[in-house]
C-alpha cells in the first residue's frame, strides 16, 4: 500500500489512512447517544469513500488544534463524538510510519487529494477486500464470502457495483466496513500475480491474420474481466497453427495476398478439372492432403500471418 502510494505520488494522503487503519476508530458512538453521535459524524461522511472520511477527520482535528489549548481541543473533540485519546494514538502511528519512510529515503511530499490515485494505492494493499454487488444489494467477496455494507457507511445508500473494504464485522449479519467505490479496471494490473485466466472459443481472425480467443480473468473467485478478445499465439500455439493452416491457408482467409496461395489454388483447380474429365478420383486433392502439405513445409513457429510473412521474407533473402 505504502509503496504503491509512493509510486502514485499520494504517500502523504495514504500514510494518514494507513495509520488510521492500524488504530481503533476515533469516532465515538455511545449506546445512549447514538443519534447525537451519528448527527455529529454526518459532517465527515463521503458518498464515495469511507477512507476519505478519515482524511476529513484528520483535517478537522488539525484545523481545530490551531489556537486552542489542550483542554479546549479535548472539549471540541468530545462535542463531535471523537476520541481524543485514540486521535493521539493515530497521530503516533502516523509519526512512526512517516519516520520509517524517511529512514528509507522515501520522499513523502504534500497532500494531493486525488481519488483514483489514493484508492489504487489502498487497493494494492487490500486486494482481498474487493467485492461486487449481487442480488438484493448483497456483496460477494473473496472466496465466495457474502456480506452487506455497514449501515453507517457513506455508501450504504449508493450500493456501487464494485467496492474495496478493509474490515469485516460479524453481528446479526456479516458486514464490511471502511469501504470505497472502485473501478474494476484497477484490479487486474495490481493483482496480476494473483489472477487466474481462462480462455474459450479460439477462432481465426481474418483482419489480423491470427487466432483470437476470449479471455476471462478472475481474482479470488470474482470475475473482474468477463470476456475480452486476446491473441492466442502465446497461449496455445499448436491450436493456432492448426487453425492457421485450415482457415488462413486452405480456405485462403487472409487479409493480404500471398502469391503461393494463388499458385497452389491454380494447381488444385487444374487437378480437379482433370479429375472431372478423366473421372480419376485419385487426382482429387483432399483437404487433409493440403493440410499435410503445408504442415510438412512450414517451420513450427509459423502460426499466423505475421510469422508467415516474416519467414517468407527471410527465405527470399537467404
Task: Tell what function each PLM region has.
Residues 157, 299-318:
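Charge-rich interaction surfaces and accessory domains that mediate macromolecular binding and assembly
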Residues 220-233:
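Extended, non-catalytic structural segments that build the interaction scaffolds
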Residues 221, 240, 245-253:
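C-terminal effector modules of nucleic-acid-centric enzymes and ribosome-associated factors
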Residues 257-265:
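Short, glycine/acidic-rich hinge or "gate" loops at secondary-structure transitions
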Residues 213:
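Active-site and NAD+-binding cores of ADP-ribose-processing enzymes
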Residues 226-228, 252-257:
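Mixed-charge, low-complexity segments
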Residues 1-208, 230, 238, 242-245, ...:
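Second RecA-like catalytic domain
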Residues 96, 249, 311:
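Catalytic machinery of carbohydrate-active enzymes
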Amino acid at each position: 500500500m505504502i509503496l504503491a502510494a509512493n509510486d502514485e505520488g499520494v504517500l502523504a494522503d495514504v500514510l494518514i489512512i494507513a495509520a488510521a487503519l492500524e488504530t481503533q476508530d476515533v469516532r465515538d458512538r455511545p449506546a445512549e447517544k447514538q443519534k447525537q453521535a451519528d448527527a455529529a459524524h454526518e459532517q465527515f461522511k463521503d458518498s464515495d469513500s469511507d477512507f476519505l472520511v478519515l482524511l476529513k477527520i484528520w483535517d478537522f482535528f488539525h484545523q481545530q488544534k490551531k489556537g486552542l489549548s489542550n483542554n479546549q481541543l479535548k472539549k471540541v473533540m468530545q462535542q463531535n463524538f471523537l476520541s481524543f485519546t485514540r486521535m493521539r494514538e493515530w497521530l503516533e502511528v502516523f509519526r512512526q510510519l512517516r519516520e520509517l519512510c524517511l529512514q528509507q529515503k522515501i520522499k513523502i511530499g504534500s497532500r494531493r487529494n486525488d481519488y483514483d490515485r489514493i484508492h489504487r494505492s489502498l487497493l494494492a494493499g487490500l486486494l482481498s477486500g474487493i467485492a461486487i454487488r449481487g442480488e438484493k444489494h448483497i456483496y460477494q467477496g473473496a472466496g465466495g464470502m457474502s456480506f452487506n455494507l455497514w449501515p453507517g457507511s457513506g455508501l450504504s445508500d449508493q450500493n456501487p457495483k464494485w467496492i474495496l473494504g478493509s474490515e469485516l464485522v460479524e453481528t446479526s449479519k456479516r458486514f464490511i466496513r471502511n469501504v470505497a467505490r472502485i473501478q474494476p479496471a484497477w484490479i487486474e494490473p495490481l493483482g496480476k500475480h494473483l489472477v487466474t485466466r481462462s480462455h474459450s472459443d479460439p477462432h481465426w481472425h481474418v483482419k489480423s491474420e491470427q487466432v483470437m480467443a476470449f479471455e476471462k480473468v478472475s481474482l479470488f473467485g470474482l470475475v473482474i474481466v468477463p470476456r475480452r478478445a486476446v491473441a492466442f499465439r502465446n497461449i496455445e500455439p499448436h491450436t493456432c497453427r492448426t487453425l492457421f493452416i485450415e482457415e488462413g491457408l486452405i480456405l485462403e482467409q487472409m487479409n493480404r495476398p500471398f502469391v503461393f496461395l494463388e499458385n497452389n489454388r491454380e494447381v488444385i483447380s487444374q487437378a480437379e478439372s482433370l479429375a472431372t474429365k478423366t473421372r480419376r478420383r485419385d487426382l482429387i486433392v483432399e483437404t487433409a492432403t493440403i493440410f499435410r502439405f503445408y504442415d510438412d513445409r512450414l517451420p513450427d513457429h509459423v502460426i499466423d500471418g505475421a510469422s508467415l510473412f516474416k519467414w517468407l521474407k527471410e527465405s527470399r533473402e537467404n
